[in-house]
Every structure is written in C-alpha cells, then in structure tokens.
C-alpha cells in the first residue's frame, strides 16, 4: 500500500485496455481469403449449426469469422472483408464477414436491416 506522498510523487498507472479485435490492427475492416468454410455448434442453452469461415488476412493473421444471414456462397479461396464483432454463443469467433462486398453475395430476400446484409433496395 503506497503512502500519500508516494502517490503524489508517482501517481497510479491506469490499467491497460484489452484489444478485443487484435487482428484488425486498428483498422475498421480487413481483407482476407477463406481457408475453410464449415459449421459449428453454439454454447450450452442454444442449439444450431452456425456458419463460420477460417480467414487468412492480408496481415498474416488467421481468424475465425461468422457468416451472417440465411445461406451464403462462400467457399475456399473466396476473398472476403471482415469487421470486428463477436458472436456470443460461439467461443473464439470475434469477427464478422461483411455481406455484399468482394466475393460475398448479399441477401436477396432481405427487407429490413438491409445494409448489414448487403441487400439491394426492393422495387
């Protein structure tokens, strides 16, 4: 326990903030190539087959990214753009793939929250 005089002289060091998306290196998005596209099962109270892809980024990192929406056209060697954002019931999945960018098609039938899924405006 420091004395008051020690605190006045040196102060306290603030706790370092942990980076939740280290592979992005401060960038809003990063480009990468899918090395594997597969499904995983979520944590305990939930049950599903969630679609994920292992992506090798341009900076050399290899990360697991979630593929949002119903249905996708991704396969090995597809070029994708990823953003930060974890999936709460999939441990180790801390990134999302952006729909409607590069090799990833947007959703056709989407009416609401279209910008998240790369969907065109319906006529």
UniProtKB/Swiss-Prot annotation:
GO terms for cellular component: small ribosomal subunit. PROSITE patterns: RIBOSOMAL_S12. Gene3D superfamilies: Nucleic acid-binding proteins (2.40.50.140). SUPFAM superfamilies: Nucleic acid-binding proteins. One of its GO terms (molecular function) is tRNA binding. The keyword Ribonucleoprotein applies. Keywords: Methylation, Ribonucleoprotein, Ribosomal protein, RNA-binding, rRNA-binding, tRNA-binding. GO terms for biological process: translation. Signal peptide: none annotated. NCBIfam families: rpsL_bact. Belongs to the universal ribosomal protein uS12 family. With S4 and S5 plays an important role in translational accuracy. This is Small ribosomal subunit protein uS12. It comes from Gluconobacter oxydans (strain 621H) (Gluconobacter suboxydans). The lineage of its organism: Bacteria, Pseudomonadati, Pseudomonadota, Alphaproteobacteria, Acetobacterales. The gene is rpsL.
